[in-house]
Amino acid sequence: IGDIEFDESQIINFPEGMLGMPTYKHYLLLQSAEIAPFLRLQSVDKPSLSFLLIDPAFIDPGYRAYVEKADQNRQYIQNEDSAVLVVCKIAKEGKDITANLVAPVVINHADMQGAQVVLLDSPYNVRHSLAEVSERTEA
């Protein structure tokens, strides 16, 4: 993919794709000091498609436990090799970044499978401002 070198074993398979984009099923999870603490979920199928992700522990330390409880029937989070991340969106002006806490991305690194799950009856918000988090950590 462009300048990105990767091994086939690094590809994460999303059998259902991401929400609203079921056609694209293969992604790479990329880390870069330039965008830390964010990660990039890069589509292998469509190089122009990527998602900005963050560990929700930066927002709410109890979020993973909530997702584990809410997702018992689907069991996407099967072991300690699973990561729970949330999709972020940057406003056009770049002044505000929001995180979707209602539809986390769960990646099981043991079998390289991923899914974006919707938490029904979630107390969380689809557009949770990261500015609130920044203000709390600076105080």
Residue positions per predicted region:
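Long, compositionally biased stretches
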Residues: I1-P61, E80-A139
